A protein has these predicted regions:
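A short, Lys/Arg-enriched amphipathic alpha-helix followed by its capping loop at the start of a domain
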Residues: 28-38
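Short, highly selective alpha-helical patches that border small-molecule cofactor pockets
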Residues: 22-26, 30, 153
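A short, glycine/small-residue-rich beta-strand->loop->alpha-helix junction that serves as a flexible
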Residues: 12-25, 51-53
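Conserved nucleotide-sugar donor-interacting segment of glycosyltransferase catalytic cores
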Residues: 117-174
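A conserved catalytic-core segment of Leloir-type glycosyltransferases
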Residues: 42, 46-134
Length: 174
């Protein structure tokens, strides 16, 4: 019997973002689900305040390189990955310099530059979904955490409803 697959679309995950209720839940939920034998994929934005060297992020060339059109403008999608130890849980980071590198080290872009939050949200959700499709990974459950993932249920249930990666997926939002 194959493992159930759970996709986590997180706004924040500790230790990449300083400890808060949301970043702690972003770590504990996927980790706990993985420990129970589920196959887990976790995604979050690659904010400018995340130190790539300290957190050992590296670009996944085979997943990067596509462009997402938002408001009639092409935006390159860069995928980075890191592994949380000791759980050995991979975290995929959705990155684009226009949306997630504006204020490195000065706080989250969603707070520092809120005028771009609508486009930032669309880019993050579409980037996550397109990456999951490219992985050819079929999620049984999609768990969305935080307002930045709020469009995920709409995309999964309407736009990508017939796509094999999401056909039949259950969606949870917290």
């Amino acid at each position: 019997m194959s493992k159930e697959k759970v996709l986590f679309v997180n706004q924040e995950i500790m230790p990449y973002i300083p400890e808060s209720e949301m970043s702690k839940a972003g770590l504990d939920l996927p980790k706990g689900i993985q420990e129970r034998g589920y196959e887990v994929r976790t995604f979050m934005p690659k904010y400018g305040c995340i130190n790539e060297r300290r957190n050992q992020l590296h670009e996944v060339i085979r997943l990067s390189g596509m462009n997402l059109i938002i408001d009639d403008t092409d935006h390159p999608l860069i995928i980075k990955v890191a592994t949380l130890q000791p759980a050995r849980m991979q975290v995929y980071f959705i990155y684009n310099e226009d949306y997630f590198q504006r204020n490195p080290g000065k706080g989250l872009e969603t707070e520092e530059l809120p005028e771009l939050n609508d486009e930032r949200c669309i880019f993050f959700v579409r980037g996550t979904i397109e990456t999951v499709k490219k992985l050819r990974w079929e999620a049984s459950i999609v768990h969305c955490q935080g307002w930045l993932s709020a469009l995920t249920p709409l995309y999964v249930k309407k736009v990508y409803a017939d796509d094999p990666s999401f056909r039949g997926s259950k969606v949870v939002y917290s």
